[in-house]
Design a protein with these regions (language model features):
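N-terminal targeting leaders
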Residues: 1-221
Length: 221
Protein backbone atom coordinates (compact mmCIF):
# COMPACT_ATOMS: atom_id res chain seq x y z
CA UNK A 1 0.00 0.00 0.00
CA UNK A 2 1.43 3.35 -1.02
CA UNK A 3 1.56 5.99 1.69
CA UNK A 4 1.55 9.70 0.93
CA UNK A 5 3.66 11.76 3.31
CA UNK A 6 1.99 14.75 4.88
CA UNK A 7 3.39 18.16 4.06
CA UNK A 8 5.75 19.59 6.65
CA UNK A 9 5.41 23.18 7.78
CA UNK A 10 8.40 24.05 5.60
CA UNK A 11 6.74 22.46 2.56
CA UNK A 12 3.51 24.30 3.31
CA UNK A 13 5.26 27.63 3.78
CA UNK A 14 7.09 27.24 0.46
CA UNK A 15 3.89 26.25 -1.33
CA UNK A 16 2.08 29.35 -0.05
CA UNK A 17 5.01 31.57 -1.07
CA UNK A 18 4.91 30.07 -4.57
CA UNK A 19 1.14 30.59 -4.80
CA UNK A 20 1.47 34.24 -3.75
CA UNK A 21 4.31 34.75 -6.24
CA UNK A 22 2.29 33.17 -9.03
CA UNK A 23 -0.53 35.73 -8.97
CA UNK A 24 0.04 39.01 -10.85
CA UNK A 25 -2.44 40.83 -8.59
CA UNK A 26 -0.20 40.26 -5.56
CA UNK A 27 3.22 41.80 -4.84
CA UNK A 28 4.59 39.05 -2.63
CA UNK A 29 7.97 40.72 -2.10
CA UNK A 30 6.77 42.37 1.13
CA UNK A 31 4.62 39.52 2.46
CA UNK A 32 5.98 37.20 5.13
CA UNK A 33 4.71 33.63 5.51
CA UNK A 34 4.95 31.31 8.51
CA UNK A 35 3.40 27.87 8.99
CA UNK A 36 2.56 26.04 12.20
CA UNK A 37 0.80 22.65 12.03
CA UNK A 38 -1.21 23.64 8.98
CA UNK A 39 -2.00 27.18 10.16
CA UNK A 40 -0.60 29.93 7.94
CA UNK A 41 0.18 33.45 9.11
CA UNK A 42 0.67 36.26 6.61
CA UNK A 43 2.57 39.35 7.75
CA UNK A 44 4.17 42.37 6.12
CA UNK A 45 2.68 44.96 3.81
CA UNK A 46 0.38 45.08 0.80
CA UNK A 47 -0.53 48.03 -1.40
CA UNK A 48 -4.32 47.83 -1.20
CA UNK A 49 -7.18 46.15 0.61
CA UNK A 50 -8.16 44.05 -2.45
CA UNK A 51 -4.57 42.77 -2.53
CA UNK A 52 -4.87 41.78 1.13
CA UNK A 53 -8.09 39.88 0.40
CA UNK A 54 -6.51 38.18 -2.62
CA UNK A 55 -3.47 37.10 -0.59
CA UNK A 56 -5.66 35.51 2.04
CA UNK A 57 -7.69 33.61 -0.54
CA UNK A 58 -4.52 32.44 -2.27
CA UNK A 59 -3.08 31.04 0.95
CA UNK A 60 -6.28 29.16 1.76
CA UNK A 61 -6.24 27.54 -1.68
CA UNK A 62 -2.99 25.71 -0.96
CA UNK A 63 -3.45 22.04 -0.14
CA UNK A 64 -2.59 21.31 3.48
CA UNK A 65 -3.62 24.72 4.84
CA UNK A 66 -6.15 24.35 7.66
CA UNK A 67 -6.37 27.93 8.94
CA UNK A 68 -5.19 31.45 8.17
CA UNK A 69 -4.16 34.41 10.31
CA UNK A 70 -4.17 37.46 8.07
CA UNK A 71 -1.89 40.02 9.72
CA UNK A 72 -0.69 41.99 6.70
CA UNK A 73 -1.14 45.75 6.87
CA UNK A 74 -2.29 47.95 4.00
CA UNK A 75 0.07 50.78 3.05
CA UNK A 76 -1.83 52.60 0.38
CA UNK A 77 -0.38 55.25 -1.90
CA UNK A 78 -3.70 57.12 -1.65
CA UNK A 79 -2.73 58.85 1.59
CA UNK A 80 -4.24 62.16 0.49
CA UNK A 81 -7.73 60.66 0.52
CA UNK A 82 -9.66 61.62 3.65
CA UNK A 83 -12.32 59.64 5.48
CA UNK A 84 -14.83 62.08 4.01
CA UNK A 85 -13.67 61.24 0.48
CA UNK A 86 -13.95 57.52 1.16
CA UNK A 87 -17.33 57.84 2.89
CA UNK A 88 -18.77 59.77 -0.04
CA UNK A 89 -17.55 57.17 -2.52
CA UNK A 90 -18.75 54.30 -0.31
CA UNK A 91 -22.23 55.79 -0.20
CA UNK A 92 -22.26 56.10 -3.98
CA UNK A 93 -21.03 52.51 -4.39
CA UNK A 94 -23.77 51.14 -2.13
CA UNK A 95 -26.37 53.17 -3.99
CA UNK A 96 -25.23 51.74 -7.33
CA UNK A 97 -25.15 48.12 -6.11
CA UNK A 98 -28.39 46.46 -7.21
CA UNK A 99 -28.15 43.69 -4.58
CA UNK A 100 -27.70 46.01 -1.59
CA UNK A 101 -30.81 47.27 0.27
CA UNK A 102 -31.15 50.91 1.30
CA UNK A 103 -30.98 49.85 4.95
CA UNK A 104 -27.22 49.18 4.67
CA UNK A 105 -25.05 52.19 5.57
CA UNK A 106 -21.31 52.88 5.63
CA UNK A 107 -19.22 54.83 8.11
CA UNK A 108 -15.48 55.49 7.81
CA UNK A 109 -12.80 55.99 10.46
CA UNK A 110 -9.08 55.76 9.82
CA UNK A 111 -9.78 54.69 6.21
CA UNK A 112 -11.63 51.61 7.51
CA UNK A 113 -15.20 51.19 6.25
CA UNK A 114 -17.78 49.78 8.67
CA UNK A 115 -21.05 48.53 7.20
CA UNK A 116 -24.12 48.52 9.44
CA UNK A 117 -27.87 48.17 9.09
CA UNK A 118 -30.07 45.23 8.14
CA UNK A 119 -30.42 42.89 5.19
CA UNK A 120 -32.86 40.10 4.42
CA UNK A 121 -30.27 37.76 2.92
CA UNK A 122 -26.60 37.08 3.59
CA UNK A 123 -25.70 37.62 -0.08
CA UNK A 124 -26.88 41.23 0.27
CA UNK A 125 -24.41 41.81 3.09
CA UNK A 126 -21.66 40.20 1.03
CA UNK A 127 -22.58 42.36 -1.96
CA UNK A 128 -22.26 45.50 0.18
CA UNK A 129 -18.76 44.56 1.33
CA UNK A 130 -17.75 43.74 -2.24
CA UNK A 131 -19.11 47.07 -3.50
CA UNK A 132 -16.86 49.15 -1.25
CA UNK A 133 -13.69 47.09 -0.85
CA UNK A 134 -11.99 48.42 -4.01
CA UNK A 135 -12.38 52.11 -3.14
CA UNK A 136 -9.03 53.90 -3.35
CA UNK A 137 -7.47 54.52 0.05
CA UNK A 138 -9.45 51.88 1.95
CA UNK A 139 -7.35 49.77 4.33
CA UNK A 140 -10.11 47.58 5.76
CA UNK A 141 -13.81 46.69 5.63
CA UNK A 142 -15.84 45.56 8.65
CA UNK A 143 -19.17 43.93 7.81
CA UNK A 144 -21.53 44.46 10.77
CA UNK A 145 -24.76 44.14 8.78
CA UNK A 146 -27.44 42.21 10.66
CA UNK A 147 -29.51 39.59 8.85
CA UNK A 148 -33.20 39.98 9.65
CA UNK A 149 -34.70 37.05 11.46
CA UNK A 150 -37.27 35.40 9.24
CA UNK A 151 -39.55 32.42 9.46
CA UNK A 152 -37.37 29.37 9.04
CA UNK A 153 -39.07 26.72 6.95
CA UNK A 154 -39.95 23.54 8.82
CA UNK A 155 -37.91 21.50 6.35
CA UNK A 156 -34.95 23.89 6.13
CA UNK A 157 -32.61 21.31 7.66
CA UNK A 158 -33.51 18.74 5.01
CA UNK A 159 -33.32 21.39 2.28
CA UNK A 160 -29.78 22.42 3.24
CA UNK A 161 -28.69 18.80 3.58
CA UNK A 162 -30.04 18.02 0.11
CA UNK A 163 -28.28 21.08 -1.35
CA UNK A 164 -24.98 19.96 0.20
CA UNK A 165 -25.34 16.48 -1.30
CA UNK A 166 -26.11 17.98 -4.73
CA UNK A 167 -22.98 20.15 -4.68
CA UNK A 168 -20.20 18.56 -6.71
CA UNK A 169 -17.44 20.31 -4.78
CA UNK A 170 -17.59 18.05 -1.75
CA UNK A 171 -19.13 14.97 -0.15
CA UNK A 172 -22.25 16.42 1.44
CA UNK A 173 -23.05 13.09 3.10
CA UNK A 174 -20.31 13.80 5.64
CA UNK A 175 -21.91 17.07 6.80
CA UNK A 176 -24.60 17.30 9.48
CA UNK A 177 -26.94 20.30 9.71
CA UNK A 178 -28.54 21.44 12.97
CA UNK A 179 -31.02 24.30 13.34
CA UNK A 180 -32.43 26.36 16.20
CA UNK A 181 -35.64 28.33 16.62
CA UNK A 182 -33.93 31.67 16.05
CA UNK A 183 -32.78 30.90 12.52
CA UNK A 184 -29.29 29.75 13.49
CA UNK A 185 -27.53 26.92 11.69
CA UNK A 186 -24.68 24.73 12.93
CA UNK A 187 -22.59 22.67 10.52
CA UNK A 188 -20.77 19.58 11.83
CA UNK A 189 -18.69 16.99 10.02
CA UNK A 190 -15.61 16.61 7.86
CA UNK A 191 -14.46 18.31 4.63
CA UNK A 192 -11.25 18.06 2.63
CA UNK A 193 -10.11 21.70 2.39
CA UNK A 194 -10.76 25.25 3.62
CA UNK A 195 -12.44 25.89 0.27
CA UNK A 196 -14.94 23.09 0.87
CA UNK A 197 -15.54 24.38 4.39
CA UNK A 198 -16.32 27.84 3.04
CA UNK A 199 -18.47 26.45 0.22
CA UNK A 200 -20.59 24.46 2.68
CA UNK A 201 -21.25 27.66 4.60
CA UNK A 202 -22.28 29.49 1.43
CA UNK A 203 -24.70 26.68 0.59
CA UNK A 204 -26.29 26.94 4.04
CA UNK A 205 -26.62 30.74 3.76
CA UNK A 206 -28.81 30.21 0.68
CA UNK A 207 -31.65 28.84 2.80
CA UNK A 208 -34.45 31.29 3.70
CA UNK A 209 -34.65 32.72 7.21
CA UNK A 210 -31.05 31.96 8.22
CA UNK A 211 -29.66 34.57 10.63
CA UNK A 212 -26.36 33.02 11.70
CA UNK A 213 -24.10 30.05 10.95
CA UNK A 214 -21.71 28.26 13.28
CA UNK A 215 -19.23 26.40 11.11
CA UNK A 216 -17.75 23.52 13.10
CA UNK A 217 -16.59 21.57 10.05
CA UNK A 218 -13.14 20.04 10.45
CA UNK A 219 -10.63 19.59 7.63
CA UNK A 220 -9.10 16.22 6.82
CA UNK A 221 -6.95 15.94 3.71
Amino acid sequence: MTQVAKSTDTDLKNAVILELSWLPSIDSSHIGVTADHGAITLTGEVHSYPEKVAAGKAALRVKGVHALAQETSVHTKWTSRTDTDIAREAGEALERAVNVPDTVKATVAGRVITLTGEATWHYQSTAAAWAVHTIKGVVGVHDRVQIRSGAVLADVKASIQAALVRNARFEGDYITVMTDSGGGITLEGVVRSPGERHQAELVAWSAPGITSITNNLTIQY
